[in-house]
Amino acid sequence: RDNTVLNLNLAFNYGGRDEIVCAIREMIREGIQADEVNIDLVDHYLFTNGMPDPDLIIRTSGEMRISNFLIWQAAYSEWYFTPSYWPDFDREELHKALLDYSARERRFGKLSTCCTEET
């Protein structure tokens, strides 16, 4: 409702593990000490610096795996898997993904409220 910006990322020839290695190498080159490293600092050195972590990641082709994609940034993302291949992914498929996403309870790593209520 209050969202005014949409970020859409398309990644080609990208690997999340390689991105993390590049970030670590850059920190070492700049002389950053181990005790200075924290989540915010690592975020700064990633390719996605300055962008919010994704809320929703759509995986096409029917594969049920993350394929080394945004492995740092996707920690609390919601995933939607569709059998459609990327060239066939259209407005209707996007609508399905967004409807599915809108029905989810975003927990950001926390337990569901149904699991934390005392009985």
Specify the residue positions occupied by each region the protein language model found.
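Flexible, compositionally biased loop and terminal segments
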Residues: 1-119
